[in-house]
UniProtKB/Swiss-Prot annotation:
Residue intervals passing through the bilayer: none
The protein's name in its UniProt record: 2-C-methyl-D-erythritol 2,4-cyclodiphosphate synthase
Site (Transition state stabilizer): 34, 133
Keyword flag Metal-binding: yes
Gene (UniProt): ispF
Amino acid sequence: MRIGQGFDVHAFCEGDSVILGGVTIPHSHGLMAHSDGDVLLHALADALLGAVALGDIGHFFPDSSEEWAGADSRDLLRRVMQRVLDEGYAVTNIDTTIIAQAPKMAPHIEAMRMNIAEDLGVPANRVSVKATTTEKLGFTGRGEGIACQAVCLLEAVSQ
């Protein structure tokens, strides 16, 4: 068994939507990023890579590379999952928490779960996506950005 933990944060910028868990959510701002800014999938990718001791997404998809400019984070997550499989591990479960004052996440949580389950090749009952606010405290509470935490549990695949 392996456990991985990931964290990501992106600041708000001009825009009219954010992408979280591969779901486009209308909002008064976008997220500043080299890729599509999906903090949920970035935190999850870091958790998966950490669990198999391969570092972080910045190592594989550097923001200094034009190759990854505007990248679809679902594609990045699928690439990370392939590396996890190549290391001989499979997902037991995923638990994530989006930290944001806005936009409201509840209407979009199920679609996020389904996207993640599809990209990881696991049943949806192994994927948890939760959301919380910081009661208007800190940078997320002031509406300056969105953060996400992710934890994964992996098990060795029988050869």
